[in-house]
């Protein structure tokens, strides 16, 4: 215990020159840097979501095409019972297609609060994927050492209406400029969800996490949901036809 405290104190001492050098960096600069790492002109990726239930876990593999923050198309690849399921986001509209029923359903209203495939993520979480700087104003609460790495602690408060999370607290790695963990709060101050990320790699000039963990804090004994990026490419040219509603049935 004492050795760990000494190590943390030593790291903080080493960090002081770095923090002084960064004193002109504003919290908005931090948000811009995070957004620059997490968002791109376009993304194409293959990934899997591991949903941990109380008794067992299941893995869903899918491939996604994303342009900016307004267009996304996802096709589920496995397991067999989920294969062929598709999801399309176009601006503020979201549709899903199930090959079992051969139906296209628009997800809206209260349905947006529903879980995606039994995971700890809701459809509204997906719809609110946009740059943090556009949604929140931030204040710097301090600096913490986590896993021997320096993190800026930011409090984010909503500056637009209608967000699921009125407040967020983020621990931003000082080198990666990524929110390595977050706590998401309701307007009442109640903790609703928590997230973390790891497996950070340099991909096409940006630091990017290859594993995300989401936990619904309102679910008793929640074991969380993992989202693992197997392969990702940024800034590819994706034709508009990829985001056609007609493609859901093909």
Predicted regions and their residues:
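Bacterial N-terminal signal peptides that target proteins for export
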Residues: 1-10
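Bacterial N-terminal signal peptides
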Residues: 9-17
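Sec/Tat signal peptide C-region and signal peptidase I cleavage site
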Residues: 17-23
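N-terminal mature ectodomain segment of secretory-pathway/periplasmic proteins
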Residues: 23-100
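A short, amphipathic edge element
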Residues: 27-28, 127-139, 189-194
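Generic beta-strand structural signal
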Residues: 66-67, 88-90, 97, 140, ...
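Acidic/charged, solvent-exposed loop-and-adjacent secondary-structure segments enriched in E/D, K/R, S/T
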Residues: 99-127
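Gly/Pro-enriched, hydrophobic low-complexity segments
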Residues: 103, 107, 127, 147-245
